[in-house]
A protein has these predicted regions:
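N-terminal beta-strand motif that seeds the catalytic metal site of vicinal oxygen chelate
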Residues: 1-25, 70-72, 124-128
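Amphipathic alpha-helical "stalk" segments
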Residues: 1-8, 46, 55, 101
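Conserved catalytic-core motifs of GNAT/GCN5-like acyltransferases
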Residues: 17, 37-42, 100-101, 128
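Short hydrophobic/aromatic beta-strand element in the GNAT-like acyltransferase core
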Residues: 17, 48-50, 57, 73, ...
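Amphipathic alpha-helical segments
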Residues: 22-37
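Vicinal oxygen chelate
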Residues: 22-23, 72-120
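Conserved short beta-strand elements that form part of the metal-binding/catalytic scaffold
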Residues: 37-70, 120-125
Length: 128
């Protein structure tokens, strides 16, 4: 069973320009673990790739940014299914460490994943 990724929002600047040191080395992780597929590649003004899944897109770029200071929030339809999916795809994390975060009037059940490139991802399901 797979979760549906509903939206992507960057922590800082731009979910279409997330910094990585090596785009080509990063792609297999995003394909295998998250189920993204490559939509397009570009070499100028810097090497970058656009990845897509469930109608959402993110971009990875060799843009000189610090991956440890960036990341993205993915809204999913079912956070427990999302964790199980990532786990079955090779996520090396025994427990999700689910927690409830509140942003404004909305509560989210979330867990975090740090990619080998240093980018941090929060996957969350809106709580009613």
């Amino acid at each position: 069973m797979k979760a549906v990724f509903r939206s992507a929002a960057p922590y800082a600047d731009d979910a279409m320009n997330l910094p990585v040191q090596d785009v080509d080395a990063a792609i297999p992780y995003y394909e295998k673990l998250f189920g993204f597929r490559v939509l397009s590649r570009q070499d100028a003004p810097h090497k970058s790739v656009i990845l897509a899944r469930d109608g959402i897109q993110i971009g990875l770029a060799e843009n000189g940014g610090d991956p440890t200071q960036e990341g993205c929030f993915f809204e999913v339809d079912d956070v427990e299914t999302a964790f199980a999916e990532l786990k079955s795809n090779g996520l090396e994390k025994e427990e999700a460490g689910f927690r409830i975060d509140r942003h404004g009037d909305t509560s989210w059940k979330v867990f975090f994943v740090v990619a080998p490139d240093g980018l941090c991802y929060c996957l969350g399901e809106r709580q009613i």
